[in-house]
């Protein structure tokens, strides 16, 4: 399974400079060594002081004293930094880079492991942290990303795949990036097998009911102002699950409040990261 580590490692200082200095194969090997060393270090710390290790990442199965803080506020050319002022920022796993939404998903998957183990899975824009969970549990999947290294280069709006191709389709924070999210939902429904499950999440602004999206291409500055990020084409509202229902799915929310505090299932790092996922069944 190929993944785009850029998704989950943008918070690491100097990572871009390292990419320029070393060839890809060496970077990949070095990355794995560093990850193993970090994982071993945190496991030793957790064993030495179990009572102080109050945080847990189900993606990499490691406990910590605290999670790491992102650098979102330092990137005003990409993020609306004002949307990170009132929310908790120490929410990133220092090993795999997971955010609350990933740890919620991994916890949910843990409770449905039998289903996943026997399912064909298509993962759009796969995150390193969730791939770690799948691999650790012996679950294979097909990855897809039109821009980064992946098994397939598919457009979620028009995959070209046969009808009813997969049992499970995952797309975390993808729908806010595509030109036509309704078309993407129709396509996912088409390629999902009967009784299959589409798991998705997207930014949800608590001040919006349904949707705020661009009607024509906006500048990066305007996207940052309205949608929180320079490559977002919309932000969804708190009743956006309506769009999933309209696409034909039977929708069940996966809420962070239903999961242990040790995984830190909080709102954040942005105020529109409500960290509500949706399990959408094709009935």
What are these regions (language model features)?
Residues 173-177:
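Short catalytic micro-motifs in class I SAM-dependent methyltransferases
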Residues 169-170:
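Hydrophobic beta-strand segment of the Class I
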Residues 5-164, 255, 261-279, 283:
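Conserved N-terminal segment of class I S-adenosyl-L-methionine
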Residues 45-55, 59, 179-188, 193, ...:
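S-adenosyl-L-methionine-dependent methyltransferase catalytic module, highlighting the catalytic core
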Residues 160-163, 178-182:
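Activation segment
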